[in-house]
């Protein structure tokens, strides 16, 4: 059986990267929450 996690840095950046987050209002909300929480790493 094929495993569910097949790592790809390109897909990782496109789906969870900073620019992907900034592209949508809900994504910007995620960044806002993570900044408020004090996360050093905001996105993948």
Swiss-Prot record:
Signal peptide: none annotated. Keywords: Ribonucleoprotein, Ribosomal protein. The gene is rpmH. PROSITE patterns: RIBOSOMAL_L34 (PS00784). Residues 1-44 are annotated as: Disordered. The keyword Transmembrane does not apply. Gene3D superfamilies: 1.10.287.3980. GO terms for biological process: translation. Coiled coil: none annotated. Belongs to the bacterial ribosomal protein bL34 family. Residues 30-44 have a biased composition (Basic residues). One of its GO terms (cellular component) is ribosome. This is Large ribosomal subunit protein bL34. It comes from the Bacteria. GO terms for molecular function: structural constituent of ribosome. PANTHER family: LARGE RIBOSOMAL SUBUNIT PROTEIN BL34M, MITOCHONDRIAL RIBOSOMAL PROTEIN 34 FAMILY MEMBER. InterPro entries: Ribosomal_bL34 (IPR000271), Ribosomal_bL34_CS (IPR020939). HAMAP family: Ribosomal_bL34 (MF_00391).
